[in-house]
A protein has these predicted regions:
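RNase H-like nuclease fold core
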Residues: 1-48, 52, 59-67
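RNase H catalytic domain
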Residues: 12-16, 55-135
Length: 136
């Protein structure tokens, strides 16, 4: 296991709120996929799904023994709230923000990188696979 990993996260909902899911992909520094997953989370907003994906991905990275994580996501709100550029005003998001910060505190270093949507295709795929599998 690599001490440093890259973590792509994405969350989505079909409707806002609507059926929602999380997705993440973890790679080592050479691009080898260490883990990827998508999971439905019930009815939620897109922002709740984004935070839930971050938490799930960070917990998975911790489970792999990572010490440093570079988080990559296309959610401007998520990335800017996690770096402190934006304040967290919504009470539901604040709880998730606090949980994400607690999980992130277990690493030696966490870096947040906001990326274009096109660069987050693998995490987005996990979200859509989970939502499609749960659809009636």
């Amino acid at each position: 296991m690599s001490d440093a990993v890259r973590l792509w996260v994405d969350g989505g909902s079909r409707g806002n709120p609507g059926p929602a899911a999380t997705g993440y992909r973890i790679e080592d520094s050479e691009g080898v996929v260490l883990a990827e997953a998508g999971e439905t989370i019930g009815i939620a907003t897109n922002n709740v799904a984004e935070y839930s994906a971050l938490i799930a991905g960070l917990e998975a990275a911790a489970g792999l023994g990572a010490r440093e994580v570079e988080v990559r996501a296309d959610s401007q709100l998520l990335m800017r709230q996690m770096t402190g550029t934006y304040r967290v005003k919504n009470a539901a998001l604040r709880e998730l923000w606090l949980k994400a910060r607690r999980v992130a505190a277990g690493f030696e270093r966490v870096r947040y990188v906001e990326i274009p949507r096109a660069e987050n295709a693998e995490a987005d795929l996990q979200v859509n696979l989970a939502l499609d599998a749960a659809a009636p």
